Amino acid sequence: MELSPQLVKKNYGNKVLDKFSAINQLISIIENSEDLQARIESIRILAQINANTEIVFKLLENLLISDSYEIIRYTAAIVIEKVFLDVALEPLKWVFKHEESLRCLLTACNILGKIDSIQSKSLLINSVKRIKNEKIAKNLNLLFEKREIDSFSSLELSKIVENYFIISDLEKKFGQISYQMKDGLIIKLDLSDVSSHVFGWTILNKFPEFMEFLTSLDSLDLKFNRLTAIPDTISLLASIKYFDLSYNKIKSLPDSIGSLNILKYLNLRYNKLKELPTSIGSLSSLTHLDLRANELSSLPNTIRKLSKLELLDLHGNNLSKLKVSFKGMNSLNQLELGLNNIENLPRCVKSLKSLKRLGLGGNKLSILPSWIGSFQSLEALHLFDNKLHHLPNSIGTISNLKELTLWNNHLTSLPKSFNALSNLKILNLSWNLFESLPSWIGSLKSLEILSLWGNKLESLPKTLENLTSLRILDLNFNNIEETPSFLSQLEKRGLIIYK
């Protein structure tokens, strides 16, 4: 039977092999196998069985310094940290001088911070002093004016060096990038659209593995790249508040995203998400969740736990029904449900009494429930591109409504209650079936834009002259032959009429 690391581990666990023999067999695999995964697993098992012999240390030291595979060097460094931390300094010095792999450099730096000896601190101080990046050096000079460099612990210094390594690597790959630092640590990082700056082989199609080292990062912008997945390690971004992943190709989110409990802004628009993890409800600080233009057909019930959420954008998904509860989402003031497959306004929306903006355009609504009038805080209501034949009388009770878009429906009239919409500024009735307008439309004294494009109007009520705030009147594609003379006074005041 071919020797395998799993078999060695099993035989050692069953006491078929003693520790010395198990170590020798694992070393044999590491040195002789052509199976990379078997070599990696053998190195890891050395840590699991606490193989703290000198021969093992020499092997790991040699792997760290000279193996051609980055993953082998990285794994060797991890095992040295776990088993040989007290003697790790010398091989780590070599890594600092000669290693080019970012992952290995970051791991070595992290280990040095944990050693916390005079020698490791000296190595880190020298590394900080050798930083030539002008922007980082300037930030560090300000930091060291407030506090002597010698007063920093090895761990604090290692974080500064790690952040420098990361910026250096990013600038090498993508050229100039945008970032902000505070006290030597990156707090804001903009990698949006970096793939367009460089040749194809350096496109950003994987989530940057170094992110776990950016423990002070509060803003990360990765929009307009080619990411397809988010790793579980996203949970390590404990300081993140602003996270933009829009315009990528992300198909799913890990459960660990729920660990980002101070995250306020999450933008995932224009991805390929088909579902959300239930852990999304654990984002207790979230105020902005943008899921526009994905492939969602449902929402998890845990969405109701987002009590601080102010904006939820679900425009352009595959939603037909919302079988969730929004009770408790008292902060939600903007809900976008446009361009879905909704035939009936979901009853769960009724509980959202703080809504100021409700987007329902581009659905299959043929009727509105009377409770639409219960949204007393609503300022903008978008119902364009549906199948509405009439509006409920209750719509006139939405006293704060300022914008109402109803273009491309099947409306022939407006309810009399409409004249109570005294704050209405924008009314779009284009591409409906109106043959006339009610005389009371002149009571909408706040109206600034009235769009009537593409109806069957032959005349206009004289009461339109009372709309002294009107700035734009669109009459294109109707049957009106001449502009009524009573509108001339409004034109003199600046009214623009499109006809």
Across the structure, where does each feature detected by a protein language model lie?
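The feature captures the LRR N-terminal capping module
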Residues: 130-223, 228-232, 241-244, 251-255, ...
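A generic tandem-repeat structural signature
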Residues: 69-120, 237, 241-252, 256-270, ...
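Terminal domain-start segments
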Residues: 19-20, 24-27, 38, 43, ...
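Amphipathic alpha-helical scaffolding segments comprising HEAT/armadillo-like alpha-solenoid repeats
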Residues: 17-30, 51-64, 85-97, 117-129, ...
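Charge-rich, solvent-exposed alpha-helical interaction surfaces
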Residues: 25, 29, 45, 59, ...
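Short inter-helical turns and helix N-cap capping residues of alpha-solenoid HEAT/ARM repeat scaffolds
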Residues: 34-35, 68-69, 100-101, 132-133
